[in-house]
């Protein structure tokens, strides 16, 4: 059994609003093993992105504990990379400079070694010929690849991905899912991947955490049975559709958490 890298121990997260406190997450307990790819599925407002923010140290839990490497998360960490829904790139910098920007921001300079590593990562994400291009010359999918390369530059142990392909069209989204699979196989990371797309979760993940509507509770944790490497043929397997239908039933089922 893989050693737990990320642990949620009976976590509750509430937010104060003008109409009173709202509980986003309640009684969430699960862990993520080293180099495990975990996808989180759930309806809008169930706290999926809140889980990610807790691991990132951007917020602190109202109750319970979130741990990384057996230590409570009390703030942002250098060993965690984040890819958001939108790539948030800097249009006045070229592609390579966007990838190396975290180094410039943190240390005030970018070394030759870091620039070389940025070029290597651009090759990994399929953009080796675009390093000198401006951001506005790239498609949405290409911009998200730049964001992934940027997140990988610091060589994080843990990669948090908050619906990174949600703004893309269906074909580009599928292409990016396979691209992410290839990158993950080349450079394994512990991944927490937030998504609304059931096929995307089944294609990418080792396990899927299915959340209830708000307050978000863990309804079920599903082991994904398909061997790696996965391919287009995986999408056509009968078991794939069976699991997709099962997850839909869980997402729309009444009731609370499964014991």
Regions found by a protein language model. Give the residues of each.
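ABC-type ATPase nucleotide-binding domains, specifically the catalytic core motifs of the NBD
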Residues: 16-18, 93, 97-114, 124
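The feature captures the beta-strand-to-loop junction immediately N-terminal to the Walker
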Residues: 41-43
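Helix-to-loop junction immediately C-terminal to a conserved catalytic motif
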Residues: 56
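Conserved ABC transporter NBD signature motif
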Residues: 64-76
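Conserved ABC ATPase "signature" region
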Residues: 112-130, 182
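Conserved ABC ATPase signature
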Residues: 134-138, 142
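A short, proline-enriched helix->beta-strand linker immediately N-terminal to the Walker B motif
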Residues: 153-157
């Amino acid at each position: 059994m893989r050693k737990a890298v990320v642990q949620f121990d009976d976590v509750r997260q509430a937010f104060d609003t003008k109409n009173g406190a709202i509980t986003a997450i309640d009684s969430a307990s699960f862990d993520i093993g080293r180099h495990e790819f975990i996808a989180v599925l759930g309806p809008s407002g169930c706290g999926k992105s809140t889980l990610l923010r807790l691991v990132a140290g951007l917020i602190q839990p109202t109750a319970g504990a979130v741990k990384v490497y057996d230590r409570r998360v009390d703030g942002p960490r250098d060993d965690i990379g984040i890819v958001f829904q939108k790539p948030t790139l800097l249009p006045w910098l070229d592609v390579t400079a966007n990838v190396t920007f975290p180094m410039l921001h943190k240390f005030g300079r970018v070394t030759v070694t870091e620039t070389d590593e940025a070029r290597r990562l651009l090759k990994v994400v399929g953009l080796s010929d675009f390093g000198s291009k401006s951001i506005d010359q790239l498609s949405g999918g290409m911009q998200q690849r730049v964001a992934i390369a940027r997140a990988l530059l610091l060589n994080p142990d843990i990669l948090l991905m908050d619906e990174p392909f949600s703004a893309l069209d269906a074909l580009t989204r599928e292409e990016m899912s396979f691209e992410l699979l290839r990158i993950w196989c080349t450079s394994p990371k512990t991944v927490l991947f937030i998504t609304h797309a059931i096929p995307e979760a089944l294609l990418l993940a080792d396990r899927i955490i299915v959340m209830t509507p708000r307050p978000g509770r863990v309804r079920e944790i599903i082991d994904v049975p398909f061997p790696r490497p996965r391919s287009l043929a995986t999408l056509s397997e009968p078991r794939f559709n069976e699991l997709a239908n099962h997850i839909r039933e869980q997402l729309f089922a009444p009731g609370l958490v499964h014991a």
